């Protein structure tokens, strides 16, 4: 479900993957190791949810996602499949705390879209610099230009760039 993927992406925002996994595991523990539905999140104490290691901003974003899901304002899995990438980005970035990177993670990992390049992802830019032995960091705009030649498989390139140690 897009709802689950959005919440997971919010939890992982701006964190090292190990830290994200630890916080996500504690988040699930609060809900008996099952991904909670929107109603369960809205009924749970905010203090309890935040105790898994979430910042106040991430907590508020998760509560807003759950609220929009409960009010049927988020597309279903069937509806979202029919939407274009730019439509999905536009829709979800209206939620406070959900930026383009968060939606791109949903597009890549939940929807399996193959032509997404998270230009603002620092690991992608640093690892490209490392791979090409460039003396200076590259900008989001530069990786956007470079990645045009990788179409229609920019998501695949992203996976490989994330995998560089």
Question: Model-predicted segments: where are they?
Answer:
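Helix-loop segments that flank and shape redox-cofactor active sites
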Residues: 2-3, 29
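C-terminal accessory module of base-excision DNA glycosylases/AP lyases that mediates lesion recognition
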Residues: 73-75, 85-86, 100-165
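Amphipathic alpha-helical segments that form the core helices of the histone-fold
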Residues: 6-8, 49, 147
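Hydrophobic (often cysteine-bearing) scaffold residues that line and stabilize catalytic clefts
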Residues: 3, 7, 15-20, 58, ...
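Alpha-helical ds-nucleic-acid-binding substructure associated with the helix-hairpin-helix region
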Residues: 15-16, 20-94, 149-151
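Buried hydrophobic packing segments
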Residues: 7, 62-65, 128
């Amino acid at each position: 479900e897009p709802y689950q993927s959005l919440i997971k992406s919010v939890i992982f925002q701006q964190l090292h993957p190990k830290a994200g996994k630890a916080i996500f595991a504690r988040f699930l523990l609060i809900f008996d190791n099952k991904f909670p539905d929107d109603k369960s999140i809205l009924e749970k104490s905010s203090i309890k949810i935040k105790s898994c290691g979430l910042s106040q901003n991430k907590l508020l974003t998760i509560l807003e996602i759950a609220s929009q899901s409960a009010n049927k304002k988020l597309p279903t899995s069937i509806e979202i499949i029919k939407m274009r990438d730019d439509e999905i980005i536009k829709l979800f970035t209206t939620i406070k705390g959900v930026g383009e990177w968060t939606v791109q993670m949903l597009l890549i990992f939940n929807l399996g879209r193959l032509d997404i390049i998270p230009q603002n992802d620092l690991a992608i830019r640093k690892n490209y610099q490392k791979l090409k032995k460039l003396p200076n960091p590259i900008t989001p705009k530069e990786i956007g230009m470079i990645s045009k030649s990788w179409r229609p498989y920019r998501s695949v390139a992203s996976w490989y760039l994330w995998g560089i140690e």
